[in-house]
Amino acid sequence: MNSFLEYTICNRGTNAYSPKAGYHHLDQAFPGPFHTGHASDSYNADGRLYVGGSNQPPTAAAQHQHQNGIYAHHQHQNQTGMGLTYGGTGTTSYGTQACANSDYAQHQYFINPEQDGMYYHSSGFSTSNASPHYGSMAGAYCGAQGAVPAAPYQHHGCEGQDHQRAYSQGTYADLSASQGTEKDTDQPPPGKTFDWMKVKRNPPKTGKVAEYGLGPQNTIRTNFTTKQLTELEKEFHFSKYLTRARRVEIAATLELNETQVKIWFQNRRMKQKKREKEGLAPASSTSSKDLEDQSDHSTSTSPEASPSPDS
């Protein structure tokens, strides 16, 4: 890559060519061999620029043509590489040089201000060591004013800008896509389950049976005594449904809680319905008969009315 630094300036005469890559057909606008009689600059064997008069030795012309051939070869190699980037940190732009043909001057385009060492150069001559010397050799790049018409170069400058704009847009799109993928990798997947999600939020209670029967599901079955069962059967014989006041009274008498009395009456009603459905027990006739017998017994035991004096 160091060979590009030795061929930065090729000609200053009328047959100067565009330093932009890919525009070798510009020589068609200026046909003819290389002019050595009117050129004021020449090359020696080591490729350095010497400013002299019109009396140029024939060996310099041969060396000049040889250097041009080598430059064309290197220029072709530069075209085959796709988007070569050079790590130079020079910030001098060729477009700021004071010359008549501004489109003829070389340009460098920065892709991203955050990336210090990456920028796109139209002609491939980008290095930090050579950037301070471009200000003093502005005339060598631009050429003499009026020597080369600016019309053929304006069209190519537009093409270079369009190509550079498309290249910059593609680079920005790639950078934004890569940044988007990095952000996506940092975020956890939405369907991931954590350990704290697997823990049961409402574990079963392990305390004692609370009052009113609000206990755990594995509540121990209540074992009623014979006295408690007898009193509950008597109460069920008189009334299948209890009021709240009567339920509290029976629970206090039998040393039970209100919920236990309520559940016993519910189970007893379900058993009674099952018996009536199977036909083992009369439906409600027995209960009605019992009520009638009790009413008759109460009336018979009541004292008779005293006879009237008229009878």
Curated annotation (Swiss-Prot):
Classification via InterPro entries: HD, HD_metazoa, Homeobox_CS, Homeodomain-like_sf, HXA1/B1/D1
Keyword annotations of the record: Developmental protein, DNA-binding, Homeobox, Nucleus, Transcription, Transcription regulation
Compositional bias ranges of the Low complexity kind: 298-311
GO biological process, one term: facial nerve development
One Pfam family per UniProt: Homeodomain
Location in the cell: Nucleus
GO MF, one example: DNA-binding transcription factor activity, RNA polymerase II-specific
TM segment ranges: none
Gene3D superfamilies for this protein: Homeodomain-like
Keyword Transcription regulation: yes
DNA-binding region: 217-276
Main location as per UniProt: nucleus
UniProt cross-references to PROSITE patterns, sorted A to Z: HOMEOBOX_1, HOMEOBOX_2
GO cellular component, one term: nucleus
CDD domains: homeodomain
Family according to the record: Belongs to the Antp homeobox family. Labial subfamily.
Its job: Sequence-specific transcription factor which is part of a developmental regulatory system that provides cells with specific positional identities on the anterior-posterior axis.
Name this protein carries in UniProt: Homeobox protein Hox-B1a
Gene field: hoxb1a
